[in-house]
Regions:
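N- or domain-start disorder-to-order transition segments that initiate the globular core
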Residues: 5, 15-34
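Zymogen propeptides
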Residues: 26-59
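C-terminal regions of proteins
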Residues: 184, 190-193, 201, 208-267
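A substrate-binding/cap region within the structured catalytic cores of diverse enzymes
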Residues: 74-192
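Generic beta-sheet signal
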Residues: 34-38, 61, 198-204
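Active-site environment of divalent metal-dependent phosphoester hydrolases
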Residues: 44, 70-71, 209-212
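Membrane-embedded segments
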Residues: 46, 50, 70-75
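Short internal beta-strands
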Residues: 62-68, 229-233
Length: 267
């Protein structure tokens, strides 16, 4: 079973609520372990700042990014570790707001990309995550079907996330694509651990960071005994959906348009 490290509340000055700890950014240097997963809302600048603070304080051997393909990450190998250089070097990359991660990239000694090609995502949608992942699918738990309750919950969440604009029966494929991404991020982290040593940090969305069905599940399946901690980041005192070892909620929420307006006949 994965061991989960919790920073001492006394040293962190933290308030413990429902066994979840809320920490200030100054406590990142107290963290020790093998793997640190830091979630985010992709458009929240304060979340990126927390991640930057974590990378600067922990000084991981490698940082895995959901937002980069392996090919894009390879292009950053010789780039000066300054935000300005990273903004320039990532211009034209596939992630639309990749420049927002320049500060995190600048503090990352080794940068690893884990984003999947669209063809792999389509394959998971049609043929399942296990077939697409390949020979290690059993090791990472992809050949084990989800419990019915979790499957239903996840399909409903995908339906809502897509603004009810896609047929409900397509959501099973969306869940498979999500499982493929989670397992792929986990594999990238284990490869980084084997190559560079601990600790390794993953920068990713909250949905992938959650401990009940995200990347930690696949790490546990593939390599029990890792010391892992997952941070979720909420906004304006509201926690993100799912379970995490630690939740940060003090970031303000940026102004956003309703993403479902594009699907509305009145929008």
């Amino acid at each position: 079973m994965i061991q989960r490290y919790t920073m001492a509340a006394a040293s962190a000055g933290a308030i413990l609520t429902f066994a979840l700890a809320v920490f200030a950014s100054t406590t990142w240097s107290a963290w020790t372990g093998d793997v640190l997963i830091i979630g985010e809302y992709h458009d929240n600048a304060e979340h990126h700042l927390q991640q930057q603070n974590a990378v600067a304080a922990v000084q991981p051997k490698a940082v895995v990014f959901e937002m980069l393909t392996p090919e894009e990450a390879a292009q950053l190998t010789g780039v000066d570790r300054t935000p300005e250089a990273m903004v320039h070097a990532t211009n034209g990359f596939h992630w639309s707001n990749i420049a927002d991660y320049a500060g995190i990239l600048a503090h990352s000694t080794v940068i690893i990309g884990a984003a999947l090609p669209r063809d792999d995502m389509r394959a998971a949608f049609t043929s399942g995550a296990a077939d697409t992942f390949g020979p290690q699918a059993t090791r990472f738990g992809l050949t084990t079907p989800l419990a019915a309750a979790e499957q239903n919950t996840r399909e409903a969440a995908q339906f809502d996330a897509h603004c009810a604009a896609m047929p409900r029966e397509m959501m099973g494929g969306m869940v498979e694509a999500q499982r493929l991404r989670d397992a792929t991020f986990a594999r990238a982290m284990l490869d980084a651990l084997d190559t560079y040593g601990a600790p390794v940090i993953l920068i990713t969305g909250n949905g992938h960071a959650r401990t009940d069905w995200g990347v930690p599940v696949y790490l546990q399946s593939a390599r029990p005994g890792l010391t892992v901690q997952s941070f979720g980041q909420g906004e304006a005192g509201v926690a993100p959906s799912g379970t995490f070892d630690t939740i940060l909620t003090d970031a303000p929420a940026p102004e956003r348009e309703d993403p479902c307006l594009a699907f509305s006949s009145e929008g």
